[in-house]
Amino acid sequence: VEHLKENREKCIDKNTLMSIIEYQHTGIIHSPFKDIKTPKSDKTRFEVLPMEFNRKEADVMAEIARLQVRIPGLHLHDAYQATSTGPLVPGCEICTRMKHMSFQLGFRCNADCPFCFLHTYRADIPDEDEKYNRQALIKEFHRRRDELEGVSLTGGEPLLHLPELEASVSEMRRYKPGLHFWVYTNGILADGERLGFLRALGIGEIRFNLAAMNYKKNILLNLERAREMFEYVVVEVPSYPKQKNELMGCLEELDRIGIDQLNLQELLVTDANVHRLEGEGYQSGFLFLKKFFLYGSRRMTYEVMRHCVEEGYSFTVNDCSASRFGTRG
């Protein structure tokens, strides 16, 4: 990686992107262009290949398009590659129109997800910066409020910040009564009391990240409780190849519960999680290779999507990737 950093300008001059290719758990380093078989005992988890920048971007997007055409009845939502198997819940509809803002209530969290792309802190550690962050976001809301249709309430874990959530929602609703709010949660604290608190605030949509606790049954029970209380219930998880089997194993249960939508996020690699993902083949070079495509994550999205269509599950499956904004990395 240091060698790549030192030679970055030289690579750009040659119109070449040095691509770090994902290591797959089968022992194959996969790229849309070639498969490189490596011994299971080989400790090298990535390989660097010279690749023309334009070819890489075009070829990967073409490969995603080929995955899409294998799935009948996909809905296209804008000029890019945002797709779903059915109609979107209101929060996602608003997002595709770029009419929403993300409101981070705090940085504290009670989970420790290896894939989390945000800087979060333990639930028992107070952080004065949280207050200043919320104040800055309220100012941003007032600057943009005329154009906004919805606000997503995130963290950290929002259910650790219920007083702040209530105050923030009340402030924004005072100036924009018709706003649609949706809350993200890892589901650990989603008991009847807290869910009832959110419903009483007029929250119309809740999203569970089941991957945070590796799809444990007690979180599925909390999800089922939420289904009885909210108009829109979404499961939103990263397409994380390491957890693919766990996700596939609970799809039938999600259909029984009656969720409205399964959002499959593209796995994001940032300075907050690269140290946890390095051992799985995701390398910190991603931070300066601006156009790297996490192809394995996108491929998993369409494999799961196709399976859900073939099984006839009632919920919409949505590809929530960076492509929906027409940009990458």
PLM regions: where:
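Flexible, acidic/Gly-rich N-terminal and inter-domain linker regions that tether
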Residues: 1-102, 111
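Conserved N-terminal glycine/acidic-rich loop preference
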Residues: 82-93, 97, 114-115, 141, ...
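Canonical Radical SAM [4Fe-4S] cluster-binding loop centered on the CxxxCxxC motif
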Residues: 90-132
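Core AdoMet radical
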Residues: 120-132, 144-161, 175-190, 201-219, ...
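Short, acidic/polar
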Residues: 134-138, 190-196, 244-251
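Distinct, well-ordered alpha-helical segments
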Residues: 163-170, 191-199, 218-222, 247
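Conserved C-terminal portion of the radical SAM core fold
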Residues: 220-328
